[in-house]
Amino acid sequence: METVQLRNPPRRQLKKLDEDSLTKQPEEVFDVLEKLGEGSYGSVYKAIHKETGQIVAIKQVPVESDLQEIIKEISIMQQCDSPHVVKYYGSYFKNTDLWIVMEYCGAGSVSDIIRLRNKTLTEDEIATILQSTLKGLEYLHFMRKIHRDIKAGNILLNTEGHAKLADFGVAGQLTDTMAKRNTVIGTPFWMAPEVIQEIGYNCVADIWSLGITAIEMAEGKPPYADIHPMRAIFMIPTNPPPTFRKPELWSDSFMDFVKQCLVKSPEQRATATQLLQHPFVKSAKGVSILRDLINEAMDVKLKRQEAQQREVDQEEEENSEEDELDSGTMVRAAGDEMGTVRVASSMSDGANTMIEHDDTLPSQLGTMVINTEDEEEEGTMKRRDETMQPARPSFLEYFEQKEKENQINSFGKSVPGPLQNSSDWKVPQDGDYEFLKSWTVEDLQKRLLALDPMMEQEIEEIRQKYQSKRQPILDAIEAKKRRQQNF
């Protein structure tokens, strides 16, 4: 579909919506074509600008969402004018929704492409994407902005292969008097150590996330993706920097690039400008090398949409016959409307990178989670109110909620007597686990699920002990900062 757009370009380029367009109802200015998925705070749709024929993306955000965060996202996009950052065209209020009109990137995110093709990327493809991404980061950092959620799901490609940074739902602005931020924000597996530790961070936090993203593009998932996210949060600051699972598969130049990104000390970590001069990036090929993988991904997507549409048509045909019998008012299901929304669900796997264990890296952690029937309201993790307890990072609340849901789902069923209460089970001494051989697979799986709440309790106790020692130090630092004129 998008290749046709290349052959029939818009009548003129849309740069910004004029005052006349902004005073109209959005339906008078745009035709909404289909739902693309979920971004931070709202649903994202593909639409066409009637006057120019240009395809755009529209994020529809419910007004009851965190308006401060939405306004901040718009503000950051408004200030950006770079070919490597998704453009902002304007916004509307429509009923209870805010419509944010943005640049459309027809090939989707890098993680979409990996998942659709069921293949990771080559070094040449990674180098080309990293070069554009670094140019976008260099621009943002020059503007004193931190993206704070760099990952393959937030790097979008247009149909020509140009990479652009997207989803500023958690981005932050640095001022001269606030050289470092102290909020924990982002997606856990990509977080820099200093972000997790809440010791203050600056623009190079994005560089750590970029290094993790490079591994993600090469291996299909970030380091620690196979373990519980809360364990990863404790491991990232304490363990040595992660590296490739099979280093022998990758060139010295690529491994050195990742090594320079994943330096634990932010003061010694390379900047975007410095990394643009790295041999791995300087030798990157043109965007034309990405066209084959983009076309392949779009072909897969189209075939899935066609297959899904056939299923929808068949369901509607069957349902319409039942509706005619059941009710005189519902003669027939609205075929066109159903088709538009349901087609998008052909990507219902989620827009994250290809992950073998979905329960380890849930789709909610990825920006642009493609529309699924049971995950309609989930997107990138949102930043919580900074006035809340600083000792309780926002991602902990998220994971605790997921644990509660898992426990309700798992333990609502009949469980054998010995497994009813996880706290009743004591860990065997001296590693004597022979008795487990007599258990059924079902009992073993239930026991494994029961271990998670025990682990959470132990982690919480450690966190509280750590916080009791850490908080006085943080208070002293904050007091000194307040006495300083400039940081």
Swiss-Prot record:
Residues recorded as bearing Phosphothreonine in the entry: 3, 183, 340, 367, 387
This protein's encoding gene: STK4
Binding site for ATP: 36-44, 59
Broad EC category: transferase
SARAH domain ranges (all copies): 433-480
Coiled-coil regions listed: 289-327
Matching CDD domains: SARAH_MST1 (cd21887), STKc_MST1_2 (cd06612)
Bias (Acidic residues) ranges: 313-326
UniProt name for this protein: Serine/threonine-protein kinase 4
Residues recorded with modification N-acetylmethionine: 1
Family: Belongs to the protein kinase superfamily. STE Ser/Thr protein kinase family. STE20 subfamily.
UniProt-annotated site: Cleavage, residues: 326-327
Chain residue ranges for the region called Disordered: 305-332
Residues recorded with modification Phosphoserine: 265, 320, 410, 414
UniProt entry tagged with the keyword Lipid biosynthesis: no
Catalytic center residues: 149 (proton acceptor)
Any Pfam family the entry gives: Mst1_SARAH
Activity modulation notes: Inhibited by the C-terminal non-catalytic region. Activated by caspase-cleavage. Full activation also requires homodimerization and autophosphorylation of Thr-183. Activated by RASSF1 which acts by preventing its dephosphorylation.
GO cellular component: cytoplasm; nucleus
Job of this protein: Stress-activated, pro-apoptotic kinase which, following caspase-cleavage, enters the nucleus and induces chromatin condensation followed by internucleosomal DNA fragmentation. Key component of the Hippo signaling pathway which plays a pivotal role in organ size control and tumor suppression by restricting proliferation and promoting apoptosis.
The keyword Coiled coil is assigned to this record: yes
Chain positions with Phosphotyrosine modification: 433
All residue ranges annotated as the Protein kinase domain in the record: 30-281
